[in-house]
């Protein structure tokens, strides 16, 4: 039967979540990020995906075991995440850089995001989770190097001490930050207005391709200290009306040819890991070989594939998923920290000047009101005398 698809886009995961949780919106399928999937399972907001597709093959097993394993780390009690969610796209957070002014060695070390050499030349993704992860990794880079703590432990540490450390580091970085970007980073990088952009790998793919068209060479790396890996996935909210159609749609999106078309359309990387995908992504013009055995299996231990889209196994080893903040108080503390970091753009001198100007304006308004009142009373007094 024919199914009409009504497509709606949200800029922020939490907006979609609120519409479902509070407004009981009857979306049949939504595609949130991994931490929202975790939250929705915890709040009993999802239906399990029925994989009885009749005569249609089940394409969901086409997903990479690596991604399935990562998703299942977020399972809640007896609720296995992969029973409720099917991964769609995935990627990393890292540094997009202009090769003419930034070396690969500089881009690889996240310490250079704090380097005064790059004053006002860096864009940061407008995402409190990604920025928190970066800052807390940088603050503990020596401990990571010594093996005292893992990237996963750090990025999921929401203690008061860790939040304070992250805030301190992000504020120290601010002289270098030209802006907090959600969608304009590619343009500014291509025009040379900024030299580095801490962003998502999918955005980096688009930026690299667009920059090449105008003769600008950009590249992307994951910091050697570590970073986060993320996933978006399909889920069926419990208020869905067309549950069967939703399940079939999710299965359809896991078909290899459809996955390839989606990758070509948006620049991000599908969670589907079939031989057809690998074959389509091999590029014999590349000089370097990558170990993608973690994703495609042992036969992909040395392949020529774009490392921006598919990171080498050694790169993935230094990445981890940032879990959801299970405690509302912890989430609130991080959001308040993020607000202070983004809002604290003014130095003390400017702040004092603003207070002085507004203070002077307030005094002037008070004096004007008083004088106006006195003139009014004086006129009344004169009328009475007449």
Each language-model region and where it sits:
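Tryptophan-centric aromatic hotspots in well-structured domains and transmembrane helices
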Residues: 10, 35, 88-90, 110-114, ...
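Solvent-exposed, polar/charged alpha-helical surfaces in well-ordered, non-transmembrane soluble domains
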Residues: 14-18, 38, 111, 164, ...
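Extracytoplasmic/periplasmic substrate-binding proteins
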Residues: 175-239
């Amino acid at each position: 039967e024919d199914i009409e698809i009504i497509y709606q886009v949200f800029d922020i995961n939490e907006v979609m979540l609120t519409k479902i949780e509070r407004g009981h919106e009857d979306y049949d399928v939504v595609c949130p990020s991994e931490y929202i999937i975790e939250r929705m399972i915890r709040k009993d907001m999802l239906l399990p995906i029925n994989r009885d597709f009749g005569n249609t093959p089940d394409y969901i097993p086409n997903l990479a075991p690596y991604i399935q394993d990562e998703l299942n780390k977020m399972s809640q009690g007896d609720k296995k995440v992969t029973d409720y969610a099917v991964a769609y796209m995935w990627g990393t957070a890292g540094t997009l850089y202009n090769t003419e002014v930034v070396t690969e060695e500089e881009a690889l070390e996240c310490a250079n995001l704090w380097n005064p050499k790059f004053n006002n030349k860096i864009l940061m993704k407008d995402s409190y989770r990604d920025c928190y992860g970066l800052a807390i990794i940088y603050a503990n880079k020596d401990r990571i190097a010594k093996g005292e703590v893992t990237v996963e432990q750090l990025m999921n540490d929401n203690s008061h001490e860790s939040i304070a450390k992250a805030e301190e580091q992000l504020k120290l970085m601010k002289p270098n930050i030209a802006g907090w970007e959600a969608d304009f980073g590619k343009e500014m990088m291509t025009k040379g207005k900024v030299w580095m952009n801490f962003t998502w790998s999918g955005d980096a793919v688009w930026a690299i391709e667009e920059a090449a068209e105008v003769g600008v060479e950009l590249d992307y790396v994951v910091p050697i200290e570590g970073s986060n890996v993320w996933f978006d996935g399909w889920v069926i909210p419990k208020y869905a009306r067309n549950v069967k159609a939703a399940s079939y749609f999710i299965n359809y999106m896991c078909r290899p040819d459809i996955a390839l078309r989606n990758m070509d359309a948006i620049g991000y990387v599908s969670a589907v890991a079939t031989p057809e995908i690998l074959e389509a992504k091999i590029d014999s013009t590349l000089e370097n070989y990558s170990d993608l055995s973690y994703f495609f299996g042992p036969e992909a231990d040395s392949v020529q594939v774009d490392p921006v889209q598919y990171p080498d196994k050694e790169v993935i080893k230094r990445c981890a998923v940032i879990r959801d903040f299970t405690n509302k108080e912890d989430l609130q503390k991080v959001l308040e920290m993020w607000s202070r970091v983004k809002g604290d753009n003014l130095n003390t001198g400017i702040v004092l000047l603003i207070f002085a100007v507004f203070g002077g304006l307030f005094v002037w308004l008070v004096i004007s009101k008083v004088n106006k009142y006195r003139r009014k009373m004086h006129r009344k007094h004169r009328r009475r005398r007449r």
